[in-house]
Amino acid sequence: MTMITDSLAVVLQRRDWENPGVTQLNRLAAHPPFASWRNSEEARTDRPSQQLRSLNGEWRFAWFPAPEAVPESWLECDLPEADTVVVPSNWQMHGYDAPIYTNVTYPITVNPPFVPTENPTGCYSLTFNVDESWLQEGQTRIIFDGVNSAFHLWCNGRWVGYGQDSRLPSEFDLSAFLRAGENRLAVMVLRWSDGSYLEDQDMWRMSGIFRDVSLLHKPTTQISDFHVATRFNDDFSRAVLEAEVQMCGELRDYLRVTVSLWQGETQVASGTAPFGGEIIDERGGYADRVTLRLNVENPKLWSAEIPNLYRAVVELHTADGTLIEAEACDVGFREVRIENGLLLLNGKPLLIRGVNRHEHHPLHGQVMDEQTMVQDILLMKQNNFNAVRCSHYPNHPLWYTLCDRYGLYVVDEANIETHGMVPMNRLTDDPRWLPAMSERVTRMVQRDRNHPSVIIWSLGNESGHGANHDALYRWIKSVDPSRPVQYEGGGADTTATDIICPMYARVDEDQPFPAVPKWSIKKWLSLPGETRPLILCEYAHAMGNSLGGFAKYWQAFRQYPRLQGGFVWDWVDQSLIKYDENGNPWSAYGGDFGDTPNDRQFCMNGLVFADRTPHPALTEAKHQQQFFQFRLSGQTIEVTSEYLFRHSDNELLHWMVALDGKPLASGEVPLDVAPQGKQLIELPELPQPESAGQLWLTVRVVQPNATAWSEAGHISAWQQWRLAENLSVTLPAASHAIPHLTTSEMDFCIELGNKRWQFNRQSGFLSQMWIGDKKQLLTPLRDQFTRAPLDNDIGVSEATRIDPNAWVERWKAAGHYQAEAALLQCTADTLADAVLITTAHAWQHQGKTLFISRKTYRIDGSGQMAITVDVEVASDTPHPARIGLNCQLAQVAERVNWLGLGPQENYPDRLTAACFDRWDLPLSDMYTPYVFPSENGLRCGTRELNYGPHQWRGDFQFNISRYSQQQLMETSHRHLLHAEEGTWLNIDGFHMGIGGDDSWSPSVSAEFQLSAGRYHYQLVWCQK
């Protein structure tokens, strides 16, 4: 044990937080989570241990701008200015200094290992009592599961130790410091330490005791570590559970270890042995260790699909059977290996349906509770995710237990990121930083290696490639050869990774960056000598309205076996709740706390909002990742299961044939598909509709029974095919009514019954419509070529740093947002049964024509207005965001009804999950409340739209809401939007894709850009 003087002054003088060689003082060795049961039955059933006591709750807290400002008296008693805060928590969420959001840039001046003298410091204290029996015998430990970023600990005025690495436990022996009666803990937490240079992750920078604190009482002679692993024969019919147990304390000949394996209440195997390890070298073996091997016949294998778990109980006892203590863990029998270029689980090639997950809560910051963790897992499972990457640090220890039990594959990642260094490997190639890096990797492995859900270790994130990585890679491979290691830094395919694990590599497009090229994922596989599997550690940047082109990745994954999936970036928007002057909550992002530097809304890349409400993109991910694939041939549906281990024992296939959303026939067939098997389903003779319309076949896989992660009726997969389009020629009903045209100097006015249409001859636009005496328009019907920029359109561009390559900057520079219409033609003709208005406009900016739009409006005796639009795009202007029409309707109706793709928001490059049907939703549901407002709510493939008294027919895309594109473009946060008068309608003949391969470079694939020179579309507008 390191002994230093107890005084605060000496601790401050040492400045351990600016010494990369000092990562801890007096911290105990890492190990799996302990409970020290004194009853083996309680260990087997995982009941709360009487030896484990939570210290979570109210602590006293005082904040200081720097550690030097902390008075020495605080070690002995609480300060007058001390407040009460809840532990665990981040102190910024209680109003003490500010959270800082940055992606790459360090939030402090880069001068490792030194940190600013203005180093916010939180002083926590707690008084508590311990059981008298704990003082008389054994060892009492205190466990801090997570403290950001470094801390010193005192107990009863005496210095205990020091710890850093905010994402792994720091555990100390308190036995020598405790006394009878009341005890007092004092914890001085520093916001910045040399460890902060290794924690430059893309997240909010927050501080404090943000994970659980507990006391653990162990006997003097105790289990100090245990490690379980499973081995198999070739066909997995026989297994061996290897359990290596280590003890500390007085080694006696009468000590024994028993390891028993349980399946529920049934003991599967058991073994007992004295201590004394196998011979290691010429000096012998470990006297304080023993390895037991238990044979298991026909083990039930663990996978994310079927997370079968056993329970291993490790007992330390005397020769006569007297129990000293027991530890336990869940055991999953599974094997991970790479063979023939494939990542295999239990001999089957995995397809990783993964997502990156930060630990984030909108109210509690980086504090995770069990309810939120379970909610995340259920949502992931319900949306066909089978894997999660702990980005970019070891998670709360409970997370792994839950992943074991519910079934998720985990990439466990070391808390190392030096993204803001230039070059990135400045620290990771420096031997002075090897001890700090080593502790972050080795302690992660020692804590988490008993979890079957952990199938891959990661050396960290975005830290370049240095010699320290190579050393730690070799250490892991030596200590735990049962799992592969991945690491993206330095090019994603270095010697420090078993898996090619790029981030944001594209399917077919190379990105030849100097030194670290990102090849297309297809090309990467074929590089000379390359035999490893490829799994994208990050892809499909889901920032705001994004995930365009996701289907392209999944086509490639299913086509090329060594492309074994990836991890979407990322799971949850990292917005935080703030309150306005009236106490109303709103969602904040970088800069909203006065934090500098900051990276604005770049913290919001989630498939779900911070409150776990899904983004529309989540449905696209669910559909592309679904475990059942379908092929239609004639009357036969071929269903293919992508489950590797699960037989379809809880699935029904519902099928329905509908004509323009009207059901004509339906049925239900139980699915009986073996893992990786197929089932052919013969449909009956389908009805032949007599009326016109599109005939669609829709299949949905429904789970009739609830599961551990889904309710009864859960839909896990679906597909839709258009069978036919019945065409009919319907002659207009004979009408003696003929629209009447009136011409004035200013307008063309057409009247028919109680309806009127007014075209302004000076502007050439439809300026007003009346039904009776009620005006229908608040703004004219005009061409529209722009959209409120998406995050993907903006990229890295900002006011102080313009990226001319970003779509929005190209559109601005070309004048798309500022273009004004010059009237070229506006004429009216009376036909035999209709009035025809013909217009032409040149949309210009600074004298340059960007678009020419020609329209005809044909208003017939039935009151229908048929609109035909032809648009020419200048060859030297950027591809436009949309080609469509826009107006502000006077009505605000409660509901929107349409025949087209839905129900969720969809875009041309993100619509595979949408189904063609007749949909009816509240107007409010047509708007997607992205925290950073942008273009949203589009519905593609629309043949009919009904809103209020109006109906539109044709083949178009639309969005409709209370917010104009202008307001969306000019507003920084969704809570600042105000419902405008009437309703804004955008009807597009064509709309550019949204992209999403990444969010900092133009990522809309060429096939989804509006690159043609001419466009033509038609629609009919009438009143019901």
UniProtKB/Swiss-Prot annotation:
One of its GO terms (biological process) is lactose catabolic process. The record marks W1000 as: Important for ensuring that an appropriate proportion of lactose is converted to allolactose. Binds 2 magnesium ions per monomer. Can also use manganese. Disulfide bonds: none annotated. Changing D202F: Obliterates all binding and catalysis. It comes from the Bacteria. Mg(2+) 1 binds at E417, H419, E462. Substrate binds at N103, D202, E462, E538, Y539, A540, H541, N605, W1000. Na(+) binds at D202, F602, N605. The keyword Ubl conjugation does not apply. Homotetramer. Mg(2+) 2 binds at N598. Its EC number is 3.2.1.23. Its cofactor is Mg(2+); Mn(2+); Na(+). The record marks H358, H392 as: Transition state stabilizer. PROSITE patterns: GLYCOSYL_HYDROL_F2_1, GLYCOSYL_HYDROL_F2_2. The active site is at E462 (proton donor), E538 (nucleophile). InterPro entries: B-gal_small/dom_5 (IPR004199), Bact_Beta-galactosidase (IPR050347), Beta-gal/glucu_dom_sf (IPR036156), Gal_mutarotase_sf_dom (IPR011013), Galactose-bd-like_sf (IPR008979), GH-type_carb-bd (IPR014718), Glyco_hydro_2 (IPR006101), Glyco_hydro_2_AS (IPR023232). Pfam families: Bgal_small_N (PF02929), Glyco_hydro_2 (PF00703), Glyco_hydro_2_C (PF02836), Glyco_hydro_2_N (PF02837), LacZ_4 (PF16353). It comes from Escherichia coli (strain K12). Coiled coil: none annotated. Induction: By allolactose. This is Beta-galactosidase.
